[in-house]
Amino acid sequence: MATSKLQAIWNHPAGPKTIHFWAPTFKWGISIANIADFAKPPEKLSYPQQIAVTCTGVIWSRYSMVINPKNWNLFSVNVAMAGTGIYQLARKIKHDYATEAEPAVASE
């Protein structure tokens, strides 16, 4: 029973014998790096980089559900990319706009 399930995974059109498995698997490195950047101060984050990560995640998440067969590895990595990108953008925006408003209020 276990061997038939493993054989089904091995022979799947998006299985380990194809680029459709390995590309999203290595793409997890980008999401893991973005999670590691949660500890980075917001002023060191880059708007263009986080916008690119977010847009890539959103666009490819949609694409992964349109192609046949559905590639759940591709979908999950891109949902993670979109989520981490949105979180990092929110941190950056909050830092940029909250810290700019504070000195103006303090000087009054």
From Swiss-Prot:
Q: Where in the cell is it found?
A: Mitochondrion inner membrane
Report any one BP term from Gene Ontology: mitochondrial pyruvate transmembrane transport
> Is Zinc set as a keyword in this record?
no
Q: Name one Pfam family in it.
A: MPC
User: Could you tell me the membrane topology recorded for this protein?
Assistant: Multi-pass membrane protein
Q: Which residues cross the membrane?
A: 19-35, 51-67, 74-90
PANTHER family, alphabetized = UPF0041 BRAIN PROTEIN 44-RELATED
Function, in words? Mediates the uptake of pyruvate into mitochondria.
The name of this protein is Mitochondrial pyruvate carrier 4
